[in-house]
Amino acid sequence: MKKKLYVIIGCFILILGWILTYFIVNNPLIIPSPIDVFNSLTDLFKSKSVFIDIYETLYRTIISFIISYIIGLIFATIASKSNKIEDIFKPLFTCLRAIPTVSFIIIFIMIIGFKRAPYYIVFIISFPIIYQAILEGYKNINPELKLINKLDNYNPIKNYLLFTFPMIKTSLITAFISSFTLSFKVEVMAETLTGSTRLKGLGFLIHIYRYENDISMILAIALLIVLLSSLFEILGKLVLKLIKE
């Protein structure tokens, strides 16, 4: 109960800070009021086309995320078998983490165009994070238990399903939950920066309103993204809690 109270207090402080900033700046073209943003959000839902934008963004996020999750799981499983293999993979993942996201966006736009670039950008950002999270799950398995299990069971598939999977299940789900929310945010960013006005999506919607200098509507879309991201995190925590029980 106290935790929820602190969250409410935190939200109140944010809104209060926003209102104070609005009055200090005294320019709605730079800092719109919370009421203006709320009205813009209402107008956004009245148009109903926003639901298509949400669907398109989620669709691209899910496709890219599932591919990155499966490949991340495969790479993490292979790397968990040997420290040497992990060291071989290390330069690849170091590079993927070190290269700025903007560089990937420019490269993919030049190579594959605006339409498909967001898919690749989400994959390239999510893949190393998923890999590392799952690999840590493998590393947390007690080495003695691994040895005992190998002695008792020589079937690798049965070994994985009956022993390894239950041991890393929480790590797999945690990686899934945390990475999906990140993937969603990256997808929106990729859509915004690729800058196509012909495609549907929340990021493309931001790009359109940026050219119209409609700060109120941009903040309304940003608020919608925050609400959706929070919803994904809440649902993820509920799923994780149910599985742990």
Q: Which functions belong to the PLM regions below?
A:
Residues 2-25:
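N-terminal signal-anchor transmembrane alpha helix
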Residues 114-179:
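Membrane-cytosol interface at the C-terminal ends of specific transmembrane alpha-helices
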Residues 83, 174, 215-245:
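C-terminal transmembrane helix and the adjacent membrane-cytosol boundary/short C-terminal tail
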Residues 24-66:
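Periplasmic/extracellular loop-to-transmembrane helix junction in inner-membrane transport proteins
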Residues 63-93:
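Transmembrane-helix boundary motif in ABC transporter permease subunits
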Residues 110, 186-225:
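Glycine-rich helix-loop "coupling/hinge" segments at transmembrane-helix boundaries
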Residues 51, 55-64, 97, 161-174, ...:
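Alpha-helical transmembrane segments of multi-pass membrane proteins
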Residues 92-98, 111, 120-134, 196, ...:
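Hydrophobic transmembrane alpha-helices
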